[in-house]
Amino acid sequence: MDNKIIYLTELDSSVDKSEPFVMGIDEAGRGPVMGPMVYGCCYAPISKSTTLKSMKFNDSKKLTEQQRDQLFDKMGESNKILAYETDVITAEILSEKMLYKKPISLNVISHESAIGLIRSVLKKGVNVQELYLDTVGPPDKYQLMLKKLFPEIGKIIVSKKADSLYPIVSAASIAAKVVRDFEITNKNFDYLNIYDQDEQLSTDFGSGYPSDPLSKKWLVKNRDKVFGYPNFIRFSWKTTETAMRGACFGVDWVLENDKLKQHFQENQNDKKRFMFFKENNIENCINDF
């Protein structure tokens, strides 16, 4: 099981969890070559919909950093109205899963995170009856999968631009974005430079998106010939592979079993046995090691 990094708030004890709730889910950091991808959810009683709209949540990408921080603080102070939960999927976990022998796609990782958040909220006894999500992959297929997994939720809508259409998804988007920014800005970059503890790692890496020239420059300047990069970087991204190719040492993996057989006797029974064992009819019961 992955070591989860979770940030959350809990509803005030005065809130009746049995009344119908609306829940929204969105992510931040899907595309960057560095740092975590964060999934966030927000949930509130449907009866508080008017209050939710008055809080003026919006797509986190359309807000300034200051506006996001202010709204996030307001969310933390409003546990009689709503609560949030986030799932931080580190670059290390993304690299590990996407570089398996049978790779797990980013879409599947995203779906698993969203499903995990839904299950977490339902486990708390929250009566979620409306669920809105920003799509990952084909909306209809994703929506059908969720309806089969959660038949107890009366209404499930998966759509493009959900963070601009539904305030509850906008709130989830803000939670995900602020938590991701916090994770990045509060990293100890000296620790991340595990290859040379005396050398400070530059934090001037721009947005972290593959198209950002500053991010590309950082990847070229900070690569190690043997280890490549600290685990803050997503090794499963094509941008990382391109930056390392030709500049870092390659590794040739021997996969064929027959190349290993030359070091061992194929038939252990062919080995000469001591006379003592033969005379006493003692057999070897272990054929493998």
UniProtKB/Swiss-Prot annotation:
Q: What is an example of a GO molecular function annotated in this UniProt entry?
A: metal ion binding
Q: Which InterPro entries does the protein's record reference? A: RNase_H2_suA (IPR004649), RNase_HII/HIII (IPR001352), RNase_HII/HIII_dom (IPR024567), RNase_HII_hlx-loop-hlx_cap_dom (IPR023160), RNaseH-like_sf (IPR012337), RNaseH_sf (IPR036397)
Query: Which intervals hold domain RNase H type-2?
Result: 20-249
Q: Which Pfam families match?
A: RNase_HII
Q: How is the cofactor bound?
A: Manganese or magnesium. Binds 1 divalent metal ion per monomer in the absence of substrate. May bind a second metal ion after substrate binding.
Which reaction does this chain catalyze?
Endonucleolytic cleavage to 5'-phosphomonoester
- The question of whether Hydrolase is a record keyword is answered with yes
Q: Which Gene3D superfamilies match?
A: Ribonuclease H-like superfamily/Ribonuclease H, Ribonuclease hii. Domain 2
| CDD domains membership | RNase_HII_eukaryota_like
Q: What GO biological process term is on the record, naming one?
A: mismatch repair
Q: What is its EC number?
A: 3.1.26.4
Q: Which cofactor does it need?
A: Mn(2+); Mg(2+)
Q: Which purpose does this protein serve, as stated in its record? A: Endonuclease that specifically degrades the RNA of RNA-DNA hybrids. Participates in DNA replication.
Q: What protein family is recorded? A: Belongs to the RNase HII family. Eukaryotic subfamily.
Protein name (record):
Ribonuclease H2 subunit A
| Organism, as annotated | Dictyostelium discoideum
Gene name of this polypeptide: rnaseh2A
